[in-house]
Amino acid sequence: MRVFVTGASGWIGSAVVPELIRAGHDVVGLARSDGAAEAIAARGAEVLRGDLNDLDVLRTGAADSDGVIHLAFVVPSVSEAATRADAEAIDTFAAALADSGKPLVVSGGTLSTPGRVTTERDELVAAGPIAARITNMKAALASADRGVRSILVMLPRSVHGAGERHGFIPQLIAVARAKGVSGYIGDGSTRWPAVDVKDAATLYRLALEKAPAGAVLNAVGDEGVAVRDIAEAIGRHLNVPARSLPAEEFEGMLVRLLSTDMPASSAITQHLLGWTPTHPGLIEDIDEGHYFS
């Protein structure tokens, strides 16, 4: 297949592109800068210059492909401008692929269902701080009604691996270095789902190749890792204590993420696609030490 990938030079794209190429697919990666173009080309993919605001470029990339994997997001925060650009990009892809039966694989985030482990069958409810993004996810799934094989890949809070520089684990390490304490909020019992980036890349490929229209897939290796265990693993490597800190010691999304229990299962996904995570879990990955070099 000829696959158009947005976010091809990003953290997840850097694993997805080689995974697709190894499986025999031809990849066209969207690049908004010279650096991104060089990174995409170095991985063996063709480059299409543009960004998520270039709808004509997105339309061309999708129309000339056998499927789209949408990994890009304009900025790392959930801003109105970013979610609007995401919505327009998804609509552009859906229109370009309409009535073709071709796959449109869109990224989301695993849900939080108080008191239990979330699954792929939980309803997408557009509420809370990421309501606009959930609306976009629902729009992507609805493109199945337009003859598109639309699929959601729901990513956990930690997509980890060697080379990660900007995710939540590097942020927690930076806080621990700055404060001399590896911290968590409360008793640290809240849990994060996690997946190795290479396992996530395999799931994106399987989704592209054989997931049915309307599928919601959880890219989860670790169902739930206690944030206290994460803090202790970081503390071991930095030789600092791990203990509870007031919420105000953390910034941005970390406060909500450290305070919210959000375990997630991928049992349905694994059964549907035959996907089995095989790479190290989050604590084992932290203990390998590459985050601290």
Task: Pin down the residues of each PLM region.
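Mid/C-terminal beta-alpha module of Rossmann-like enzyme folds, strongest
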Residues: 2, 182, 203-254
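Conserved Rossmann-fold NAD(P)-dependent oxidoreductase catalytic core, especially the SDR/UDP-sugar
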Residues: 81, 88-130, 151
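Conserved beta-loop-beta element that borders a ligand/cofactor-binding pocket
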Residues: 138-162
